[in-house]
């Protein structure tokens, strides 16, 4: 408790400055609302290129114009791709023709918001360029940065060179970076104080005068900051290093904690939006923990490493849980393996081999070992799901960490256990219609998560493309779905119902099965396609029978048609006093048959068939059902013209929700009381 008081009871100047910074950040980030200097309908723009990324056939760069803009340009030929980095340089002035696009917010709850991410960087638009023209060359600093970037990009081992030298992880393959993240060691790829100390080691050895050394290293580090693109973790590391040197030379006697907090104050004063930068949060939270517990990091090398890994793990846990909704309990041990390997061998050897290129073959060997061990250990990850932590839990977790008592670990574990139990203590029903673009994905959740059911998974057809167009990262449409599920504490499904085998309904099933425990899969009576064969061959139990307590589910369509859409499983779901009908992609022909065979009146929730196509949801069918709510799962600006205007007219007596306009839709039912929430883009 004394240590906690010591941290909280700064002198009045520090405390007042902290209060001022807090008010300052809130005022400039929450009260003032910023808007673009562009109208959004401009078709041309000019500015300076400040960063470049090339991935497959997509060239992206940051353009400094009236304001910062993200520019996307799609390369037309392989020859153009091979030459484009010799034509476009960092610092070039360019003239562009194309169109502005406003970034979309996250339409699936608890997932990454690209719109908020760009807003916090004061970027309000992306620009889709159709043509470009270089109208001015770059200056000296940008020439240095451009040459360094191009040299790294064309090197063998460019992925690690770019990560360790410029702090850019974009060239790392998705498999390798995912392994770093799952193993809890992705922080080793971020440039930190250790890297900064290593970079200036030579200068400190050559220049003995401390003031001259500070001057030279400060210039060098400021240049390095410019080269790396001024990211939060690098700014923190450099500022901390410089302030620590000043503190020593001027004999100011400030503690490392004072210097760290002063660094945070300074960064937030210059850019208050840094408070929402994930790199800033991770960097300061972990560094705070290390400085705060520095007295405990004692003993032999192994013990120091173990204690450091535990401190890093604990202080980063709430942030990691809020981002990924899971943590790897083995990351402490994995850090003990990788921290010395990367910090003492791989990182310094990467710098040396970049300067002495003939050593790159040895570096390749070290990288291969690193990647193989990393991927191998990923298979033994001990991942536990942590549903979205309430703010009060996060604050409590850190307050307990500030009280230096060994028995407090019990309270930290209790917080995690309670987080785990929160979904089990939820006695509501939920039905989610997730925004998966031009596809279908619905989720049923019973009280206490005792029964969870997924109806379709979403997806899209993978068209064969040339190798030069292929992106480095394998993107799955269901990655957002999986993150959402984990945020809600849903780690398994009793049933995954695939209404039919079309890609927009079933393509993401395998990726979901890889990440979420699916106990049973329900397939329709139609012919089994290649995707469905993969599902069956995975060894999962395939059934058409349900054993449920909270939901009553009937498949109303057991006939066999020539058209796969008409073979769709039509799910009639009832619970409490509510009736749900999920039509898959069934056409009006099947609808008429249903009306002849079943009493389908006063349906509360109609999942409209075939994304609102004109071949489904006939007037007669709607008049009979009299749906209260109609949900259309449809992609924004889709090429099919869905939903059809006639279908919207047919449904006009019901409340219509569309995923292209409303995003994901949640229906929460508690004691027959209905609450509706949408997540519009």
Residue ranges and their predicted role:
Residues 272-275, 378-381, 385, 389-392, ...:
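Core dinuclear metal-dependent hydrolase active-site scaffold
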Residues 497, 503-537, 627:
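Active-site HxH/HxHxD metal-binding segment of metal-dependent hydrolases
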Residues 120-240, 245-246, 314, 494-495, ...:
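Aromatic-rich juxtamembrane segments at the membrane interface
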Residues 288-387, 628-632:
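Alpha-helical transmembrane segments of multi-pass integral membrane proteins
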Residues 491-504, 606-610:
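Metallo-beta-lactamase
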Residues 593-664:
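Cap/insert and terminal regions of metallo-dependent hydrolase folds
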Residues 3-7, 18-187, 465-467, 476-483, ...:
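Membrane-interface helix/helix-cap signal primarily in integral membrane proteins
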Residues 2-8, 13-23, 127, 176-332, ...:
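Hydrophobic alpha-helical transmembrane segments in multi-pass membrane proteins
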């Amino acid at each position: 408790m004394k240590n906690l008081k010591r941290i909280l009871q700064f002198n009045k100047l520090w405390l007042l400055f902290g209060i001022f910074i807090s008010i300052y950040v809130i005022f400039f980030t929450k009260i003032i609302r910023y808007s673009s200097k562009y109208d959004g309908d401009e078709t041309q723009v000019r500015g300076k290129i400040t960063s470049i990324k090339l991935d497959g056939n997509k060239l992206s760069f940051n353009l400094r114009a009236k304001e910062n803009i993200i520019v996307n340009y799609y390369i037309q030929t392989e020859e153009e791709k091979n030459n484009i980095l010799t034509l476009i340089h960092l610092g070039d002035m360019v003239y562009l023709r194309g169109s502005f696009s406003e970034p979309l917010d996250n339409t699936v709850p608890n997932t990454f918001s690209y719109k908020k991410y760009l807003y916090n960087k004061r970027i309000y638009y992306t620009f889709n360029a159709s043509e470009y023209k270089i109208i001015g060359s770059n200056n000296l600093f940008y020439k240095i940065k451009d040459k360094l970037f191009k040299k790294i990009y064309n090197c063998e081992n460019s992925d690690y060179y770019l990560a360790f030298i410029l702090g850019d992880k974009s060239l790392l393959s998705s498999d390798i970076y995912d392994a770093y993240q799952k193993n809890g060691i992705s922080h080793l790829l971020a440039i930190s104080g250790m890297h900064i100390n290593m970079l200036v080691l030579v200068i400190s050895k050559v220049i003995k005068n401390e003031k001259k050394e500070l001057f030279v290293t400060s210039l060098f580090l400021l240049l390095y900051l410019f080269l790396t693109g001024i990211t939060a973790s690098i700014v923190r590391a450099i500022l901390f290093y410089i302030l620590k040197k000043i503190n020593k030379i001027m004999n100011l006697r400030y503690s490392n904690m004072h210097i760290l907090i002063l660094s945070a104050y300074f960064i937030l004063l210059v850019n208050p939006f840094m408070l929402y930068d994930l790199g800033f949060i991770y960097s300061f939270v972990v560094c705070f923990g290390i400085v705060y517990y520095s007295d405990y990091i004692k003993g032999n090398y192994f013990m120091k490493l173990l204690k450091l890994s535990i401190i890093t793990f604990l202080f980063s846990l709430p942030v990691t849980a809020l981002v990924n909704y899971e943590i790897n309990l083995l990351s402490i041990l994995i850090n003990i393996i990788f921290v010395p390997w990367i910090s003492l061998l791989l990182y310094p050897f990467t710098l040396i081999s970049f300067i002495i290129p003939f050593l790159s073959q040895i570096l390749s060997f070290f990288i291969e070992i690193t990647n193989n061990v990393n991927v191998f250990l990923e298979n033994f990850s001990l991942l536990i799901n942590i549903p979205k932590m309430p703010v009060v839990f996060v604050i409590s977790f850190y307050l307990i960490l500030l009280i230096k008592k060994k028995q407090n670990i019990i309270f930290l574990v209790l917080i995690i256990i309670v987080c785990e139990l929160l979904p089990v203590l939820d006695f509501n029903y939920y039905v989610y219609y997730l925004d998966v673009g031009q596809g279908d994905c619905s989720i049923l959740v019973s009280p206490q998560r005792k029964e969870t059911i997924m109806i379709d998974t979403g997806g899209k057809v993978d068209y064969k493309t040339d190798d030069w167009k292929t992106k480095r990262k394998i993107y799955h449409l269901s990655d957002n779905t999986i993150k959402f599920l984990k945020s809600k504490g849903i780690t398994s499904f009793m049933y995954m119902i695939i209404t039919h085998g079309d890609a927009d309904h079933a393509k993401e099933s395998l990726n979901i099965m890889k990440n979420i425990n699916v106990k049973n899969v329900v397939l329709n009576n139609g012919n089994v396609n290649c995707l469905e064969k993969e599902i069956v061959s995975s060894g999962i139990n395939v059934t058409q029978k349900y054993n449920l307590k909270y939901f009553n589910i009937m498949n109303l369509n057991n006939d066999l048609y020539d058209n796969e859409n008409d073979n769709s499983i039509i799910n009639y779901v009832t619970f409490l006093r509510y009736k749900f009908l999920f039509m898959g992609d069934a056409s009006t022909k099947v609808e008429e048959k249903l009306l002849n065979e079943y009493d389908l009146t006063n349906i509360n929730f109609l999942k409209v068939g075939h994304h609102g196509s004109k071949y489904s949801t006939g007037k007669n069918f709607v008049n009979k059902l009299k749906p209260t709510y109609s949900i259309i799962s449809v992609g924004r600006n889709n090429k099919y013209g869905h939903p059809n205007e006639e279908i919207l007219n047919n449904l006009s007596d019901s409340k219509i929700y569309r995923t292209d306009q409303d995003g994901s839709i949640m229906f929460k039912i508690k004691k027959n009381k209905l609450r509706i929430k949408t997540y519009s883009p």
